[in-house]
């Protein structure tokens, strides 16, 4: 099975192709260019390099969040469009799970974290045992102090991955000496991790439905928060 995967949930973007569980090829760009300009081009270039045509792809996947609202929308829209045009399965996977699948090099506890701004991180942690990934909590948005409370009773090394790894490490190391910061190249969101997460979903018997793929933002966008605050003020004014 050939899986084409998109990752555009943060600053970097990429595409990857997985062939029967083995990475066939991957592109990665961290130049700051707009994902809407680069993502499909990278996927097309990768398929040509691998001597594949769009009709050769058996399934498509995208990082469905959490992450940048715009980036997640671009990636999921690209995956859904590709799937609908070819009538193939489409999988939306957790950005956090994909990061751990792409970075885990040994058994242990992995804490995936993305900088969510406003003194928060998008976070989930996982255990890797005998090479198999086990989720320990749902994806969520946490303040750093809340993350500390959640991790403080773990008495094993905790490997940090994601673009929020350095933030968590620098903020919490004094209180959590078990923290371990993985090298920078392993902390980036990668399309290969998305492909591996999609392969795991397929192996588990999940059916990828493009119509059911929706972004998982975990919290409201800034525009939505501002609109809600405006509505609250208007309601308060009406009640005076």
Region annotations inferred by a language model:
Residues 46-50, 85, 103, 191-202:
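Stable alpha-helical structural segments in soluble proteins, enriched in small hydrophobic residues
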Residues 182-240:
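Acyltransferase
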Residues 50-55, 106, 152-156, 202:
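Glycine-rich phosphate-binding loop signature in dinucleotide/nucleotide-binding domains
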Residues 1-64, 188:
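N-terminal beta-alpha supersecondary unit
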Residues 63-90, 95:
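DPxDG-like acidic metal-binding loop motif
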Residues 22, 34, 89-188, 217, ...:
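Surface "functional belts" at beta-alpha junctions
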